[in-house]
Structures are given as C-alpha cells and as structure tokens.
C-alpha cells in the first residue's frame, strides 16, 4: 500500500451523487492525506438507495495508507444539520481538519497549502479558517500566495477545533440585547448581508443547527479573519438539477453567478510566499460583495431579471413559481423579526 503524502485530516461530506463525488475522491487520492472522515446522510426514500450505494463504492477505493473513519446515517437528516453534525464529529477527534463536500473539487496542492496554514496559524486567534475558493479567481496586485479577508467561501475550507468549539448551535446570542445591537451595527458598517439576523431567527425556529449562520456569527463576534489563496484552488460542481442550493443548471444562472461555477482552479507552488502582516484585504471584500450582489441592489435586481428570462427561455416554469413563493415567504417572515 502506498504511504500517505500529507499529514492532515480531511472530512468529506456526501450523499447520493457518485459522479461528482468521484471527481473529489480522485483529487484526494492524488494528494493522499493521512486521515479521512467520511460522512454520508441517510436516504429520504428508497429512490436514494442506488446513489447512496454507488457513493460508498467510490469511497471504498482508498488505496494508500490512510486512517479512515465513517459515519453513515441510517435516516435522513438533510443538508442541515448534517453539515454541523459531521463537522463537530470530525473536530471532536482532531485539532485541525480540511472540509470538502461532494461538489468541491480541489487542486492537489490545496491539501499541502492547508496543512502549512493550519500549522503556521494554529495558535493565532485572529485566524478563523482557511478558504480554498477565491471569488475573483485571481486577486490582482497581491505579491503573496494568500491574504486575509473578513469574507470567505465554504467551498473547500479548513479550520481548527479551537474555532469549532466557539460555535453556538442554540443561537443564544439572539437573546443578548447589547451584543445583538453591536452585531447589527457591525453588519451595517461592513455592508454584510442585510438578511443575516433574519436567517439566524429562521434557523433557530426550524430547530436545526445550520452551520453557515453559526460559523459566520462566530466569526463576526470574534473578529475573525479567513486566509484566502491569491489564486483559486476549488471548482464547485453544485449548479445541477439535483443540487441542494441551486435549481436547474449552470445555463440558467445569471452570468455574474455562472462565472463562479466555471472559473479555473490553480496549483500553488512551494515554498509559499507569506504576507508580511496580518491585515484585511478590504479590496477583496468589496469585490466579493459586488460579485455576489451584497449591498448592490441594482445588481441583484438585474440578475433576478436575467434569471427569470433564462428560465422562461428554457421553459422552467416550476422553478419560476417556486422562486416567487420563496421570495414572498421570505418577505413575510423577515417582517416578523423587525
């Protein structure tokens, strides 16, 4: 059996999409990490069973010296709280870990990059996570291989147990009047998502631990920074008809969103060029907000109209109806938390 190449744990979350998962596993096999945590949600119905079985066959193809842990659920928990459950599980056994979902295809050097960052910044409380995805693809004018940002993507990331231990799965911060006022002011000052607090209220009402809002809240309250590679290291395969967060296909996404699913991924060269200071790259934050349309209502409106046109063009009337219903429900529920 071949020896491992990089001494770093990796958590892989998957469900019933063997085609996407096989691309992720192929890159993991090329990197050969020392430890794997495999998490699979359970079936919603018998129709999921063939895909679930096929995914397990993919993950059985581990042909190097690797410590493997598996958590295969018997029942279906859904994307949330499966994300939270799997991450707490992995970080309960290791102090640092890389996290990949079944549609996050990393460059091979991403694993060594994360290993070096996890070791270098392990004791630095300013650093919350290491991202693999760069929304700009290549951030111009940066003379280093990575920089620091207050905004980040969770499409392939790594962090430490010290960070995950700060997570508040019960959203108790919503009951803290003073610190909620501070959070509201911080969100306004940073021009962060206006619906973030609404999302937190909605998630606690659903009685589920949604790790994205839990993670972002922890990062905001603790003034955390993310490490972002200067050149993108992740491809996301999530814009498909069976994806969790997107409906239809990449062809019906507005052009501004489509590019983030079609951009290149790059390999980083070692030794890394390290930044001289730990300071936020504000220009990157502004660029990401513009790309995602956060704080740019006219960009949002334009993309909504573009998406409507594309779905009409492709005859996706059920998606249009669902989107309208979701938008109305969102407006109505948001009013309850004002």
Language model features: what each stretch is:
Residues 1-99, 104-338:
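Peripheral/terminal regions associated with large enzymatic or DNA-binding modules
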């Amino acid at each position: 059996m071949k020896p491992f190449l990089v001494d770093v744990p990796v958590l892989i979350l998957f469900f019933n999409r063997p085609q996407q998962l096989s691309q992720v596993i192929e890159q993991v096999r090329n990197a050969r990490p020392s430890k794997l945590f495999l998490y699979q949600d359970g079936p919603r119905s018998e129709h999921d069973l063939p895909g679930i079985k096929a995914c397990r066959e993919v993950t059985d193809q581990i042909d190097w010296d690797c410590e493997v842990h598996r958590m295969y659920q018997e029942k279906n928990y859904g994307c949330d709280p499966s994300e939270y459950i799997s991450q707490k599980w992995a970080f309960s056994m290791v102090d640092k870990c890389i996290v990949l979902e079944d549609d996050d295809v990393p460059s091979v050097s991403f694993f060594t990059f994360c290993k070096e960052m996890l070791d270098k910044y392990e004791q630095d409380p300013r650093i919350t996570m290491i991202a693999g995805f760069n929304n700009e693809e290549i951030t111009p004018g940066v003379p280093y291989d990575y920089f620091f940002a207050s905004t980040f993507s969770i499409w392939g990331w790594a962090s430490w147990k010290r960070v995950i231990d700060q997570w508040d799965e019960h959203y108790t911060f919503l009951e803290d009047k003073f610190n909620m006022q501070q959070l509201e002011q911080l969100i306004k000052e940073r021009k962060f998502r206006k619906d973030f607090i609404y999302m937190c209220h909605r998630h606690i009402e659903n009685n589920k631990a949604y790790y994205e809002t839990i993670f972002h809240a922890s990062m905001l309250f603790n003034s955390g920074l993310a490490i972002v590679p200067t050149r993108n290291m992740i491809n996301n395969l999530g814009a498909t008809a069976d994806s969790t967060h997107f409906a239809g296909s990449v062809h019906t996404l507005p052009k501004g969103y489509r590019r983030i699913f079609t951009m290149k991924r790059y390999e980083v060269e070692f030794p890394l060029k390290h930044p001289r200071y730990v300071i936020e790259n504000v220009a990157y934050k502004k660029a990401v907000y513009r790309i995602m349309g956060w704080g740019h209502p006219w960009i949002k409106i334009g993309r909504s109209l573009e998406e409507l046109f594309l779905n009409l063009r492709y005859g996706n009337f059920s998606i249009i109806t669902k989107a309208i219903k979701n938008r109305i429900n969102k407006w109505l529920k948001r009013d309850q938390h004002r």
